């Protein structure tokens, strides 16, 4: 049967590739799709929705990890601990707004000294003229 295309069973079986690798992501697209379907957020879930959500989550995780790594390096540490994540999130304006109501366990508080409690500068006052 010439001209009928490939016959069944001929050639090597095609290696399956994950949707994460097709999208160039590290986060699991298939697992996120399963969670979206099982969570009953909608009756149906489009094919692009889990890919987009995985990309957004991966970007946020990378952003937080980069800032937390910088905070750890500033403190001369090689391991990221919750304190570094807290410092990274609270020092970034957009992440602080996004995670404003989130409590990070073992994160501590942001260092803050009220201006009234700071020592006064000696050279800042102007000399007064007396006649």
From Swiss-Prot:
Localization: Nucleus; Chromosome
DNA-binding as UniProt keyword: yes
Feature: compositional bias, Low complexity: 9-23
Region of interest called Disordered, as start-end residue ranges on this chain: 1-23
Primary localization class, coarse: nucleus
Gene3D superfamilies reported in the protein's UniProt record: Histone, subunit A
One Gene Ontology cellular component annotation held by this UniProt entry: cytosol
CDD domains: HFD_H2A
Entry keywords, A to Z: Chromosome, DNA-binding, Nucleosome core, Nucleus
Posttranslational mods: Not ubiquitinated.
A GO term, aspect molecular function: protein heterodimerization activity
InterPro entries: Histone-fold, Histone_H2A, Histone_H2A/H2B/H3, Histone_H2A_C, Histone_H2A_CS
Tissues where this protein is expressed: Expressed in meristems and dividing cells.
Oligomeric and partner information: The nucleosome is a histone octamer containing two molecules each of H2A, H2B, H3 and H4 assembled in one H3-H4 heterotetramer and two H2A-H2B heterodimers. The octamer wraps approximately 147 bp of DNA.
The protein's role, per its UniProt record: Core component of nucleosome. Nucleosomes wrap and compact DNA into chromatin, limiting DNA accessibility to the cellular machineries which require DNA as a template. Histones thereby play a central role in transcription regulation, DNA repair, DNA replication and chromosomal stability. DNA accessibility is regulated via a complex set of post-translational modifications of histones, also called histone code, and nucleosome remodeling.
Protein family per UniProt: Belongs to the histone H2A family.
Protein name: Probable histone H2A.3
Taxonomic source organism: Arabidopsis thaliana (Mouse-ear cress)
